[in-house]
Amino acid sequence: MEPGAWGNRTAVTDFILLGLTGNVRLQPILFVVFFFAYIVTVGGNLSILAAIFVEPKLHTPMYYFLGNLSLLDIGCISVTVPPMLVCLLAHECRVPYAACISQLFFFHLLAGVDCHLLTAMAYDRYLAICQPLTYSTRMSREVQGTLVGICCTVSFINALTHTVAVSVLDFCGPNVVNHFYCDLPPLFQLSCSSIYLNGQLLFVGATFMGVVPMILISVSYAHVAAAVLRIRSTEGRKKAFSTCGSHLTVVCIFYGTGFFSYMRLGSVSASDKDKGIGILNTILSPMLNPLIYSLRNPDVQGALKRVLTGKRYPV
């Protein structure tokens, strides 16, 4: 389609992603590195899922949410890394307009569910430590399913809103995206129509998908910390904190990189720094999550050993 052929409609039919580097010599090395990272991430998260499935001790609300988080991590990295690997092999990355918009939608859908699921996990820890007597009834299977359903619904609305808002923008000039996947800030930079509404939607979305969950997580853990500090036994304190330490580490990595990427409200321009943060957010975080959750958890470690060795759980 030629520019201006359809009036105010989108004239650009595809986008060219610059990727991580234009150095042809580095591209094979990057392919090997990120292919390895992808295999490790998918394998690690599938191992966590298998461990939760085979280990009766892990059939609890906390690990139900962790299993969903593992599925989300597989989805998030699968949305961005395989297309990037294809581009590294081809030495050029030309993405059709529809494919770019689809990638944008699914990335924000999965990342949004991730945000709210981490909040649900914090609420679960709050109930387990601060309200142990009513925990089993207040975190029943129905409640668990409802929380996951709410996470998905809110994230779907957010992702759909951003996708529709981007799809009505005019792209009638440059089509080179300075990133390795299609995301909001670099696409805003290419629009030849006003992005004021998109900027406001991004602010509102970042508030509901990032700030509000982070406040809820902070409040939950403030209550948890207060409850743990009232425990007189040092061993009891360590055990209580150990169940929350892994989750807090994941929260810090996920929200730290996410806020840096989307809360720079004064600028929507893309830069090489955004690519580095994008790697942390889309690749490193999903890859580290299985390691973080299994590193100091003997139940998960035991289940993983049985999965890897093929041994059944002792009856």
Curated annotation (Swiss-Prot):
Provide the residues annotated with a glycan attachment (glycosylation): N8
- Keyword Glycoprotein part of the UniProt annotation: yes
A Pfam family cross-referenced in the UniProt record is 7tm_4
Extracellular compartment spans? 1-28, 90-97, 167-200, 261-274
Report the SS bond pairs.
Answer: C100-C192
Cytoplasmic compartment ranges equal: 50-68, 119-145, 222-239, 296-315
A Gene Ontology molecular function term for this protein is:
G protein-coupled receptor activity
Membrane disposition: Multi-pass membrane protein
Gene Ontology terms describing biological process? G protein-coupled receptor signaling pathway; sensory perception of smell
Q: Which PROSITE patterns match?
A: G_PROTEIN_RECEP_F1_1 (PS00237), G_PROTEIN_RECEP_F1_2 (PS50262)
| Alphabetical list of InterPro entries matching this protein | GPCR_Rhodpsn (IPR000276), GPCR_Rhodpsn_7TM (IPR017452), Olfact_rcpt (IPR000725)
Output a single Gene Ontology CC term carried by this record: membrane
For this UniProt record, the keywords arranged alphabetically read as follows: Cell membrane, Disulfide bond, G-protein coupled receptor, Glycoprotein, Membrane, Olfaction, Receptor, Sensory transduction, Transducer, Transmembrane, Transmembrane helix
Cellular localisation: Cell membrane
- The portions of this protein that span the membrane are 29-49, 69-89, 98-118, 146-166, 201-221, 240-260, 275-295
* Role, per record: Odorant receptor.
**PANTHER family attached to this UniProt entry:** OLFACTORY RECEPTOR (PTHR48001)
Q: Into which family does the record put it? A: Belongs to the G-protein coupled receptor 1 family.
What name goes with this protein? Olfactory receptor 3A10
Natural source organism = Mus musculus (Mouse)
Source lineage: Eukaryota, Metazoa, Chordata, Craniata, Vertebrata
Q: What is the gene called?
A: Or3a10
